[in-house]
């Protein structure tokens, strides 16, 4: 266990990790530009984290939820861009996003999620009343079930960001 600013720490070590976890930054009132102010959430930073993941390792990033969704979906979009920049053809196969009423957790796997991992993620979320917003193969009926929002904003956002018109959604 190392408690340090992740990007700076990882640039000083060649070691690979099974899990790299980034906690939510700032308070819930940090505002629209909260992620813009931190260099730990850039495409380049995410690539640094990927470079330090063990085979089948995970990057877990927590963020505060604001409505309409901002930071969680911006982070999801950044992860997609970072994965594509490393040559990953199907970023959605390596991503999962779950949420509670006030936080979300983005999981990025070094490799595609297995069926067993998806089953475990779904069961973990169900037992704790977390909503799933994305995992490979998610169906609309599995989103927005516990902490119900007016619309399944997070599910809709992740689908749009992974779809063919992602630039229209993010732009």
Where do the PLM segments sit?
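Soluble catalytic regions of membrane-associated enzymes that act on cell-envelope
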Residues: 1-112
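Soluble small-group transferase modules, centered on the S-adenosyl donor enzyme superfamily
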Residues: 5-7, 85-171
């Amino acid at each position: 266990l190392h408690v340090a600013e992740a990007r700076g720490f990882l640039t000083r070590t060649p070691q690979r990790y099974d899990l790299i976890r980034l906690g939510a930054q700032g308070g819930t009132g940090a505002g629209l530009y909260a992620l813009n102010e931190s260099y730990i959430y850039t495409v380049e930073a995410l690539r640094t984290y990927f470079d330090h993941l063990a085979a089948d390792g995970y990057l877990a990033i927590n963020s505060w939820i604001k409505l309409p969704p901002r930071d969680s979906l911006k982070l999801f979009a950044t992860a997609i861009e970072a994965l594509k920049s490393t040559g990953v053809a199907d970023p959605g196969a390596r991503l999962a996003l779950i949420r509670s009423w006030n936080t979300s957790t983005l999981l990025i796997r070094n490799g595609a999620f297995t069926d067993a991992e998806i089953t475990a993620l779904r069961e973990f979320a169900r037992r704790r009343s977390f909503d799933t917003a994305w995992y490979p193969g998610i169906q609309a009926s599995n989103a927005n079930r516990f902490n119900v929002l007016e619309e399944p904003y997070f599910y809709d956002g992740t689908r749009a960001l992974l779809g063919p018109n992602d630039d229209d959604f993010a732009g």
